[in-house]
């Protein structure tokens, strides 16, 4: 069966081609480059003055989320051009002309390629040799070409240095994201990953009203997945669905967390913008590959979430 996961080059040119095909309302932009000089692409969809960020694959082991975000961007662009409603409810053109989407499907291109093809894909000989000396199997490697965990590299409260040579925002990929967050600010961040099937919202260096807004939007998104889950459970007989989880920005040293948040992009974005930042984990294990049919089904599960976020934000459901 045909596998869905695409190479970095194919993902990059898929975004570039979308911008060319739908040039009146889609823009392609390179926001920076990795340490091994792979460009980090971003696609802007819609004409809204403000933006909602959709971020994928800071962890190189996240091999599915880039494909989902690119596939989702293709569906949005086609629906926008044709004036279609998604799920017979979401008016794509109306929503994206209020808040446009900034889709960054592959924030760690070096780690993504390492996980697929091994350390030999790293062109810089010094980085390549350093990575091989770590004796970590390439399929278990989620860091960038310098061996740094990008999801722990943002300058948040409670940031902790975990190895020599690492400081807050020391990595090119993180610097690129920080620049675009600061330039656009935006109305929110949805960060997509694999692993657990859940939606995370954050507490910490924000006031109670902002925490309430984050929880309310996260709950709205969960309810959207619940409605789709009920239909799928009725069809398959299996229990499905996302659960909601609160995360503190600072996790005590004696407390374990499945997603340690100090240095993570979501609390950083929340701190600099005072806007909600949610992490959506799609419930697929690292190393799992999907067929095109499975990718399409997984995309249908989450494609309404950015739209529901914009709808909730612009319709007064969250104030």
Predicted regions, residues:
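Short beta-strand element of the alpha/beta-hydrolase
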Residues: 51-59
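Soluble metallo-hydrolase cores and metallopeptidase-like ectodomains found primarily
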Residues: 3-52
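Short glycine/proline-enriched loop/turn "hinge" motifs that connect secondary-structure elements
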Residues: 44-46, 140-143, 268-274
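Conserved hydrophobic/aromatic pocket- or pore-lining residues that grip, position, or stack substrates
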Residues: 37, 57, 103
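Active-site/substrate-binding loop(s) of hydrolase catalytic cores
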Residues: 49, 63-210, 279
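A generic structural signal for alpha->beta connector loops
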Residues: 23-25, 39, 98-100, 147, ...
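C-terminal accessory segments enriched in acidic
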Residues: 1-9, 14, 18, 22, ...
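General small-molecule cofactor/ligand-binding pocket signal
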Residues: 29, 102-104, 245
């Amino acid at each position: 069966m045909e596998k869905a996961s695409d190479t970095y080059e194919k993902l990059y040119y898929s975004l570039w081609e979308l911008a060319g095909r739908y040039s009146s309302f889609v823009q392609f932009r390179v926001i920076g480059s990795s340490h091994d000089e792979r460009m980090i692409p971003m696609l802007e969809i819609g004409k809204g003055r403000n933006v909602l960020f959709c971020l994928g694959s800071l962890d190189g082991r996240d091999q599915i989320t880039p494909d989902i975000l690119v596939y989702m961007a293709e569906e949005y662009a086609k629906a926008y051009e044709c004036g279609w409603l998604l799920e017979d409810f979401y008016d794509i053109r109306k929503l994206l002309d209020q808040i446009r989407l900034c889709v960054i499907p592959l924030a760690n291109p070096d780690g993504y390629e390492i996980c697929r093809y091994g350390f030999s894909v790293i062109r810089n000989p010094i980085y390549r040799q350093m990575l091989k000396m770590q004796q970590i199997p390439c399929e278990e490697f989620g860091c960038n070409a310098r061996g740094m965990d990008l999801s722990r590299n943002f300058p948040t409260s409670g940031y902790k240095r975990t190895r020599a040579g690492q400081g807050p925002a020391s990595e090119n990929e993180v610097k690129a994201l920080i620049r675009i967050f600061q330039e656009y600010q935006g109305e929110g961040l949805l960060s997509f990953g694999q692993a657990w099937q859940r939606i995370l919202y954050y507490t910490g260096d924000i006031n109670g009203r902002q925490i309430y807004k984050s929880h309310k939007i996260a709950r709205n998104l969960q309810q959207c997945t619940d409605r789709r889950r009920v239909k799928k459970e009725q069809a398959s007989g299996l229990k499905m669905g996302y659960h909601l989880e609160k995360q503190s920005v600072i996790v005590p040293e004696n407390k374990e967390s499945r997603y340690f948040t100090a240095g993570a992009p979501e609390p950083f974005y929340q701190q600099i913008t005072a806007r909600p930042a949610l992490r959506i984990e799609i419930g697929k294990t690292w190393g799992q590959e999907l067929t095109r049919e499975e990718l399409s089904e997984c995309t249908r599960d989450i494609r309404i979430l950015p739209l529901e976020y914009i709808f909730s934000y612009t319709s007064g459901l969250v104030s």
